[in-house]
């Protein structure tokens, strides 16, 4: 049995910038919706990310009811991620927000695909099974980074805390059947694919991922599948979604499966592109700064001291961060125009984070008596340390002492003194020549 999964792998930005790829995306999704509505046998997996459909609906907002109807019939599989992020160059919190946003959007379409699909990330962090389990997922699907010790198509992947998910190894990649329909005799090509993959699958149906980067299914897909099944009896081809295969084809008990704990970062079977770690380092620095401002400053300070929850601003900041976390975005392996766009989005996230944090600081400072000084600790633990203050004091003060709220005097040291400006004048342009 060949379980054929029509899909595409959609890099939102990579060797071309986002808007140029979106031109092709709209054509692809238009065709998928038309074909799914015309024939209930047609199904399609949207690459494990909701961003594809969000980008599409910005151009075709009237198509959302069509998408919801096809998700309800099981013909379209959407989510659970918002973006297929790199897992090592962003923080754990960014990965959490990515999954949270993706599940939320997919459920508004009808339901999120029940598989943590990670087809093209450049290796996988050790905590991914833990994250998936916390979000209610028991299954994952991966390609890059799987070590040679895994000799079956399915294995149990565990995080350091013991959380585990049943994981489908995409043998041969997310496009192992991408060229199937380019051969003169597709039935023979299908048999060769089966023979090549059977060592990993044994008696289980073979998972054939029919799709690759920015690709669409051939127009005669259903007819060709029918012809293969009619012409020969050696094997059958069944169309389905990825979730349909992973959830409906148990391969023994979990105890019988190969086990792996920790990160998946082997290059034994696929290139994990380690060079992206040091490509366009400025993007990595900007990302870390924006993450720190949102997660460590803006949100905690707003929760503790803010007078109103700035939900839309925080949501926008995280949206810009997640949009920048794509495995061809934050990695810096795309075109120069892509890097420029990523830098702008990260800058917006940092602006929102710093602005919200400073707004809280201003609110706190406004609550203290006139002449007092407010010192705000942004850390999630008590701190003692040096505080650098700029104070305005009378010229005849020889020393300055600070009294704490409990009456104790704080040790102080004056590091410098500058005279206050006592006169200023605005010079009209016509007087500049006189100076």
Region locations from a protein language model:
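Catalytic-domain carbohydrate-binding cleft regions of carbohydrate-active enzymes
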Residues: 1-378, 385, 397, 405-415, ...
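Catalytic core of carbohydrate-active enzymes
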Residues: 429
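Glycine-centered coil/turn sites that cap beta-strands in beta-rich domains
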Residues: 385-393
């Amino acid at each position: 049995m060949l379980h054929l999964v029509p899909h595409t792998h959609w890099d939102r930005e990579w060797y071309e910038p986002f808007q140029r790829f979106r031109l092709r995306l709209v054509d692809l999704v238009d065709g998928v919706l038309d074909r799914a509505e015309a024939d209930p046998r047609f199904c399609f997996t949207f690459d494990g990310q909701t961003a594809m459909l969000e980008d599409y609906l910005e151009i075709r907002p009237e198509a959302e009811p069509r998408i919801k109807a096809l998700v309800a019939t099981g013909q379209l599989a959407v989510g659970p991620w918002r973006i297929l992020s790199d897992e090592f160059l962003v923080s754990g919190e960014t990965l959490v927000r990515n999954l949270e946003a993706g599940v939320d959007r997919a459920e508004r379409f009808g339901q999120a695909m029940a598989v943590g699909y990670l087809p093209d990330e450049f290796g996988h962090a050790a905590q991914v099974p833990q994250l998936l389990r916390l979000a209610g997922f028991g299954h994952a699907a991966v390609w890059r980074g799987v070590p040679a010790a895994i000799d079956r198509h399915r294995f149990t992947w565990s995080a350091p805390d013991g959380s585990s998910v049943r994981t489908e190894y995409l043998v041969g990649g997310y496009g192992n059947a991408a060229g199937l329909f380019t051969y003169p005799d597709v039935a023979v090509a299908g048999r060769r694919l089966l023979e090549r993959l059977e060592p990993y699958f044994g008696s289980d149906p073979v998972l054939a991922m029919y799709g690759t980067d920015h690709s669409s299914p051939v127009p005669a897909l259903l007819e060709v599948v029918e012809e293969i099944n009619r012409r020969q009896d050696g094997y059958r081809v069944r169309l389905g979604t990825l979730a349909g295969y992973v959830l409906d084809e148990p391969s023994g008990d979990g105890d019988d499966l190969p086990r792996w704990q920790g990160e998946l970062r082997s290059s034994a079977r696929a290139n994990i592109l380690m060079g992206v770690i040091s490509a366009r380092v400025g993007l990595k620095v900007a990302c870390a700064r924006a993450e720190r401002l949102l997660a460590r400053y803006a949100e905690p300070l707003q929760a503790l001291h803010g007078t109103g929850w700035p939900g839309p601003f925080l949501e926008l900041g995280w949206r810009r961060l997640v949009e920048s976390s794509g495995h061809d975005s934050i990695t810096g392996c795309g075109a120069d125009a892509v890097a420029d766009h990523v830098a702008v989005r990260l800058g917006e996230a940092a602006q929102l984070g710093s602005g919200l944090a400073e707004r809280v600081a201003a609110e706190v400072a406004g609550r203290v008596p006139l002449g007092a000084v407010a010192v705000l600790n942004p850390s999630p633990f008590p701190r003692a340390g040096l505080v650098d203050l700029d104070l305005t004091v009378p010229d005849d003060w020889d020393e300055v002492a600070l009294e704490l709220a409990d009456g104790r005097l704080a040790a102080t040291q004056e590091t410098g003194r500058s005279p206050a400006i006592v006169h200023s004048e605005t010079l009209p342009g016509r007087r500049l020549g006189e100076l």
